[in-house]
Amino acid sequence: MKKLMKTVLLTTTAFAMTGMVSCPKARADSGKTLNWSVQSDLETLDPQQCVDSTSGQMLNNTCEGLYRHGTNKLEKALAKSCKVSKDGLTWTFKLREDGRWSNGDKVTAGDFVYAFRRAVDPKTNDSNANLFGSIKNAGDIQKGKKKPNELGVSAPDNYTFVVHLSAKVPYFKSLLAGYPFAPVNRKAVEKYGKKYGTAAKYTVSNGPFVMKTWTGSQQRWNLEKNSHYWDRKHVRLDKVHVMVVKEASTGYNLYQTNKLDMVTLSNQQARNLKNNPEFVTREQGRMDYLSLNMNNEYLKNRNVRLALGYALNRKDMVNKVLGNGSETPLSGVPRDFMTYKGKDFANASHTKNATTYDRKKAQNLWNKGLKELGKSGQDVTLTLLGDDDDTTKALNEYIQSAWQTTLKNLTVNVQCMPKTQRIARMMKHDFDVVYTSWGADYNDASTYLNLQAKDSNYNFGQWDNDEYNKLFAASATTDAGNNQKRWNDMVKAEKMLLNDGGILPTLQPSNATMLKKRVRGLVYNPVGGYNWKGVYLK
């Protein structure tokens, strides 16, 4: 499940910012209504079109696939049972027969077949299509060499779903818990066409909740209990009222007046409230990093890229700028995310070029890089673009100061923009540098390494390295069944990426929040996010 979190863009061309959106009027409800806040707009309810964290959060609670993310574990959802062949290539799922769509239709194996084929169909333009790459023929379908109906999935009967893999995938079951692998209602998709998922009335769901009141543009909406959901007796909320709150001061005021049950805190608020009994900080299973556009006249130079990294004091970023429990990074993969034989992947793939702060080295590399480009002594101007929430603004200001005070002749201009505009520019590679945060789709380091693969839709900077691509491909194919070789492939590839300055890891974020004591049964998984299914209010 691709989760693009708070993101900052750097571009050499500034453009005007318009349409700053004000916070909607809040309304507090009691009883069985949970009042929740998010920091960015909802963009889609189509699991094959989602690229942002807010949409992902809503999809995690309105659609349901074979498995769900529980508290640090997977739970069966529509999968009643699973049988895997001895070679690990054929997965046969028996489905629950009481699964229902919000329109009353039965959820069948055919819905999964349709959804998987739709995801890999080039016409869908699904940014998450690469996640299906291990399924037989998926790659050829995405390249237009084969048809979607040749994908290695089938439905022998209404409640049997079979998946054929081209290579063993150690994390396949975890992958299936993500919303990209949820079924979709073919009748609804064909009825609404391109409108599907763009508003509540153009959406059909099969999860614990259904979306209500969202028209596709406003900054508050309701999720209501799905009366057709197979496990509705364990859904204790009647409604989740969600509002977009970008300013931390506004959010905390709403929280104090009981109009919100959960709010994300700014860095200063986190410091002031860390001893409050309602203060909660959570590791988010994601990594902040700078993606650099290799087509930029300056950033195509390795020494220039590394200079930008060495100029960042990551300890200051987590302690002085944020102060919310975030950690400095070791590599482009979070600490304690993946281990093998007692070794942590982040430690194993750590390189000095990735995370070290050294002003003198940054200056030397900067001067060397500009000389190699024939631009010594020339002024360099970059415009720093970022989301319009308080946390991103604070990070923008730090980066502006760090780069301007360390690197000679560099000017950094700062602008803020709504997340929807930023994502649109990022997906078109219309930037110089993107400060982005990637949330894990599944419990394996490949969810991060895949981002920089040549054919990945999320290789925003278009970094390309033949050896990296070969190593990553081997880890997913020829070496997939050999844990040691697979580990070595990925560690070597990650080091190669970092030593080349392909990305610049900035920090491993945590989320500092206030959560009302009346909220019980809330499940949080660093991979799957918040699960409201079992929440109740006391």
Model-identified regions with their sequence ranges:
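Detector for C-terminal structural segments
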Residues: 311-341, 390-400, 427-538
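Surface-exposed binding/hinge segments that line
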Residues: 128-187
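Aromatic- and charge-enriched surface segment that lines or borders ligand/interaction sites
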Residues: 80-131, 162, 298-300
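Gly/Pro-rich hinge or "lid" segments in bacterial periplasmic/extracellular proteins
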Residues: 165-239, 249
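Ligand-site clamp/hinge motif
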Residues: 226-271
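Ligand/substrate-recognition segments at binding pockets and active sites
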Residues: 216-218, 359, 367-440, 511
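Structural transition elements
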Residues: 328-369, 391-393
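N-terminal lobe/hinge region of extracytoplasmic solute-binding protein
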Residues: 37-86, 204
